[in-house]
Design a protein with these regions (language model features):
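Gly-rich Lys/Arg/Thr-decorated short loops/hinges at beta-loop-alpha junctions or inter-strand turns
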Residues: 23-35, 108-114, 190-207, 285-307, ...
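Substrate-contacting helices/loops that form the catalytic groove of nucleic-acid
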Residues: 174-209, 267-288, 299
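Conserved helix-loop functional segments at active or binding sites
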Residues: 53, 226, 263-267, 353, ...
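C-terminal binding/interaction regions
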Residues: 116, 120-121, 134-164, 169-171, ...
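Active-site loops and adjacent core secondary-structure elements that bind or stabilize anionic groups
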Residues: 1-198, 213-231
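Glycine- and Gly-Pro-enriched alpha-helical subdomains that act as flexible
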Residues: 72-110, 241-341
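Active-site-proximal loop/turn and secondary-structure-junction residues that shape catalytic pockets
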Residues: 70, 124, 236-239, 247, ...
Length: 392
């Protein structure tokens, strides 16, 4: 297949639309089912690059959950504990390493992952297909699909689920192009190899950087490489727990991603795990209710008479601000990556509140000394990578 004609571009009025290889060669993808759209394909191709790099750095299967050309989550295939299985709604499933990777990628920020495009580093197995089957998703890209997985996925969305197979040996040209307003932009493909050498320049007094934290920092940097800038990523135990994408202020990235990380951890509190949902309440409705319950804005409405009865068998007790603050003190060992330098130490102060102990960022700010001093105040370990990771 040398070109794929699309229904339309970013929006329905943007016609005609297609993808093709500029040199006239075959596309490195095959559409096995469905009719993927312009944004679906942007998500698929960015997501595939991300999971390929995660697998390379970890030697484990990897998955990502993409929405609007940024990852909502990404992870490697580490086994889940019972609490994570419960908050990800997978405690009733048998999980392969690849399925565990997607459960983590989808589960960290389920509100953002609703209607995602999935990328898998490995051949999709039956266990992963069964997990995908029951989630609201636009499609999946992988290097292959076992027969059972393909049969399961082809039945999704009444046979219209987007399934894309990519040639895992494909490599792009060194030079890439795109057009904006009729003007062609040309640049070298971002083939930066993210590896442990980027973490050697530790600038804080605390030089301790365990191997598992090095891996988490590398995961954060790979995620940032394929996230719309400005971006910041919090990672713990092989998975993103908070991604702040596409913000024009660094501190807003750090706050947004930190708030997502906080929500991930708040969902693990006993009062949230024990919420008395009625039988038959769908996962998406549970996700929405939990998001409100752990938030500060609309919880009174959720728990008001005439409202809680729609979701719960009995009225839950409020999760107070003081209780949430106390619970969040238990979050620790978090790694943080930033796609550009921190201009002010307020980013470090905010990161500390979400359990961050290890940081990787380019460095190069006029206020690097103040940022390092703030890290030293909290005994954090910070590496200057010297590499910016903007993505647009």
């Amino acid at each position: 297949m040398k070109e794929l004609v699309l229904k339309y571009g970013c929006n329905p009025n943007q016609k005609p639309a297609k993808i093709y290889m500029e040199n006239g060669s075959e596309l490195p993808i095959k559409v096995l089912c469905g009719n993927p759209g312009y944004i679906n394909l942007l998500d698929a191709l960015n997501g595939w690059q991300l999971v390929s790099e995660l697998k390379k750095v970890s030697n484990l299967p990897a998955a990502t959950s993409f929405k609007h050309v940024s990852p909502a989550g990404a992870a490697i295939g580490l086994e889940l504990d019972e609490v994570l299985k419960k908050i990800y709604w997978v405690d009733d499933l048998t999980l392969s390493p690849l399925a565990s990777a997607y459960a983590r990628a989808r589960g960290a920020d389920r509100m953002s992952s609703f209607g995602d495009f999935i990328a898998l580093s490995d051949i999709c197995d039956k266990e992963t297909a069964l997990l995908i089957k029951r989630e609201v998703s636009d499609g999946v890209i992988a290097p292959g699909f076992c027969d059972e997985a393909l049969e399961i996925l082809k039945a999704k969305k009444n046979g219209k689920y987007n399934i894309i197979q990519i040639d895992e040996n494909y490599t792009p040209d060194d030079i890439e192009k795109k057009q904006v307003f009729g003007i062609t932009f040309e640049q070298g493909h971002n083939n930066l190899d993210i590896n442990k050498s980027l973490l050697e320049n530790i600038v804080t007094k605390n030089k301790n950087l365990p191997e598992d934290k090095k891996l988490d920092l590398l995961i954060s940097l790979i995620i940032l490489k394929y996230t719309q800038s400005n971006s910041v990523c919090y990672v713990k135990d092989g998975q993103a727990i908070g991604i702040g994408a596409g913000q024009q202020s660094r501190i807003h990235c750090t706050r947004l991603a930190g708030n997502k990380a906080d929500n991930w951890f708040l969902r693990q509190a006993k009062c949230v795990l024990d919420l008395p949902f009625k039988d038959g309440i769908k996962r998406a409705d549970r996700d929405n209710a939990i998001d409100v319950y752990i938030g500060d804005n609309s919880v009174e409405e959720l728990l008001s008479d005439g409202m809680w009865e729609h979701l719960f068998t009995k009225r839950p007790s409020e999760f107070t601000r003081e209780e949430k603050k106390e619970w969040l003190k238990n979050l620790s060992g978090v790694c943080l990556g930033s796609d550009a330098f921190f201009p002010f130490s307020d980013n470090i102060e905010r990161a500390k509140r979400s359990g961050v102990e290890y940081i990787a960022q380019p460095g190069g700010s006029l206020r690097d000394d103040a940022v390092i001093e703030c890290c030293d105040k909290y005994n954090m370990t910070m590496a200057f990578t010297g590499i910016r990771l903007f993505h647009h």
